[in-house]
C-alpha cells in the first residue's frame, strides 16, 4: 500500500491534471463503487484505475481476473497495474477506445475518471463508449466529490438513463457520492 501511495504522489506531482485527485480513493469508496459485483457479474471494465484501488475491490468481490479489463493512460500506472494484477487485461488506451477493444456485453463499467473536470467533448466520448459496450441492463458506476451528479442532465436525457444516487462516503478525501446509471 505504501508503494501505491508513493506512486500516486509521484504521478500527481508530474501530471496533476491527468491524476486530478488530492489522494487515492479510500477502501470505503472502493467498496461502495463495487457494491453488487460478484462472481456472476460477467465482464467488468474499469476506466481510470490509477493505482488499482477499485480494481482490488472488484476482484475482492469475486470478479474473475479474466473478466476484468482496465483502461489507463498513465504509463507508470499501467506498469504497476500489470505487475499487481496478473490475469487482468490492462490497456494503455483512452476509455473512448473501449468500443474497439471490448465487446458490447459488459455488465458494469466502473469509472474513476474525473468526468466533471474534463472538456465536454471528451466527457461525452467516454460516456458514449461506456454505453456502447454495456449490455442492455448494464450499469455505469461513477463517483463525484460535488453535490451534483457526475453526468450533466443533458447527457442523462440524451442517453435515456435512470440515475441511482448512493449515500455520501465520508471516509474518503474528499468525501464522495457514488452514482449508478442504466439505460431506461
Tell what function each PLM region has.
Residues 3-37:
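Class I SAM-dependent methyltransferase Rossmann-like catalytic core
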Residues 74-76:
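Conserved SAM/SAH-binding beta-strand->alpha-helix loop
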Residues 87-96:
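Conserved SAM-binding strand-loop segment of SAM-dependent methyltransferases
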Residues 99-109:
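A short acidic, Gly/Pro-enriched loop at the edge of an enzyme's catalytic core
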Residues 134-145:
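Conserved beta-strand signature within the Rossmann-like core of class I S-adenosyl-L-methionine
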